[in-house]
């Protein structure tokens, strides 16, 4: 199955692995394993545009910058393929919690239109 979600550099490989432990074949790849790690140090706009071309949503913790850049791309009619961000209440080292939140959410959200959409986990 083609990966539909990209875990950003602020997440751990353990997070992606935990998602696949909960659900075998879960469609996520860590940024270090995508495109040979070419986007590990990429600026947010470049990463969002590359993900748009690949049809992949970004998953991560970049609450300060990602929404701003995603919104700018949308306003400029360039768009993005979707963003899922963890709220401050989710610890960056709580891989199991991150995985449970994402796998549960993705069961509901996988078929949504993700173009220019930003979601936060956990949902209110």
Put a short name on every predicted segment.
Residues 1, 52-54, 79:
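Residue-level preference for short coil/turn positions at secondary-structure junctions
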Residues 44, 51-52, 56-73:
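Acidic, metal-binding active-site segment of PIN/NYN-like and related structure-specific nucleases
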Residues 50-55, 103-107:
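A general structural signal for short secondary-structure boundary/capping elements
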Residues 3-35, 45, 70-124:
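Acidic, PIN/NYN-like endoribonuclease modules and their adjacent C-terminal/linker elements
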């Amino acid at each position: 199955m083609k990966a539909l979600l990209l875990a950003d550099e602020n997440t751990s490989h353990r997070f992606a692995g935990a998602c696949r432990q909960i659900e075998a074949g879960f469609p996520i790849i860590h940024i270090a394993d995508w495109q040979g790690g070419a986007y590990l140090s990429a600026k947010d706009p470049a990463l969002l545009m590359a993900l748009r071309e690949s049809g992949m949503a970004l998953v991560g913790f970049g609450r300060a910058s990602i929404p701003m850049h995603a919104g700018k791309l949308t306003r400029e009619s360039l768009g993005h393929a979707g963003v899922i961000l963890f709220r401050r209440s989710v610890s960056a080292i709580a891989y199991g919690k991150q995985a449970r939140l994402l796998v549960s959410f993705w069961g509901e959200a996988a078929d949504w239109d993700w173009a220019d959409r930003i979601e936060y986990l956990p949902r209110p």
